[in-house]
Amino acid sequence: MSNLFKEVRKLIYIIVGIAGILGALSRYYLGLNITTFWHHSFPLATLLINLIGCFFLAWLTTYIARLNILPSEVITGIGTGFIGSFTTFSTFSVETVQLINHSEWSIAFLYVSCSILGGLIMSGLGYTLGDFLIKKSLTEGDYS
């Protein structure tokens, strides 16, 4: 393994780690702010955070990654580090189990449905926006 390759791998670990810290802190801060005005059993904070993450990950991988304006290490840091720690499948799963354990079946069903369908819709919107911006860049000659 070459020294350059080892250095790049170290850099990726550092970028993903720092981005992960920032993503986790952002999720925590946003979650706190949402729960200050939302006082119902439906886990709105986690749902909104995960939907935002779905949109931005799809947009990132469709638009930013294809533009070649950022090094792949930074794209990995943003996608895996920031967005990966910003979104939370485990919290979604635990909150769903808690709703079921409290016999809040309709809220659990609504939460799972909104999470899955909303995630697919937001990912689709992020992809569509990214694809639109790529095509716009191509027609304007900004794409490298």
Swiss-Prot record:
GO BP term (any one): fluoride transmembrane transport
GO cellular component, one term: plasma membrane
Assigned keywords, A-Z: Cell membrane, Ion channel, Ion transport, Membrane, Metal-binding, Sodium, Transmembrane, Transmembrane helix, Transport
UniProt keyword Cell membrane present: yes
Reactions accelerated catalytically: fluoride(in) = fluoride(out)
Segments passing through the bilayer: 11-31, 44-64, 74-94, 107-127
Keyword Cell membrane in record: yes
Gene Ontology MF, one: fluoride transmembrane transporter activity
UniProt cross-references to InterPro entries, sorted A to Z: FluC (IPR003691)
Pfam families linked to this entry: CRCB
Activity regulation note: Na(+) is not transported, but it plays an essential structural role and its presence is essential for fluoride channel function.
Source superkingdom: Bacteria
Topology with respect to the bilayer: Multi-pass membrane protein
UniProt record similarity statement: Belongs to the fluoride channel Fluc/FEX (TC 1.A.43) family.
HAMAP family xref list: FluC (MF_00454)
Described purpose of this protein according to its UniProt entry: Fluoride-specific ion channel. Important for reducing fluoride concentration in the cell, thus reducing its toxicity.
UniProt-recorded name of the protein: Fluoride-specific ion channel FluC 1
Native source organism of the sequence: Bacillus cereus (strain ATCC 14579 / DSM 31 / CCUG 7414 / JCM 2152 / NBRC 15305 / NCIMB 9373 / NCTC 2599 / NRRL B-3711)
